[in-house]
Amino acid sequence: MLHYAVVFFIIALIAAVFGFGGIAASAAGIAKILFFVFVVLAVASFLFGLIRKG
């Protein structure tokens, strides 16, 4: 599960670069939404991983 948390976090960072950096202005809205979705998924995966190991 920790692996998925890292993957989701990396995807969130990539979405943030596109959304907040102005690189792709036409996709900025979608990238901002994806950033928050993947941050939530990363946190959820991290918490589930901690619960399973605990």
UniProtKB/Swiss-Prot annotation:
Q: How does it sit in the membrane?
A: Multi-pass membrane protein
Coiled-coil annotated spans: none
Q: Pull one GO CC term from this UniProt entry.
A: plasma membrane
Tell me where it resides: Cell membrane
Keyword presence, Transmembrane: yes
Check the record and name the Pfam families matching this protein: DUF1328
Annotated keywords: Cell membrane, Membrane, Transmembrane, Transmembrane helix
Membrane-spanning residues where? 5-25, 30-50
- Where is this protein chiefly located? membrane
Task: Report whether tRNA-binding shows up as a keyword of the record.
Answer: no
NCBIfam families recorded: PRK13682.1-1, PRK13682.1-4
Q: Which family does it belong to?
A: Belongs to the UPF0391 family.
The record's HAMAP family line, in alphabetical order, gives: UPF0391
Protein's recorded name: UPF0391 membrane protein Mpe_A2904
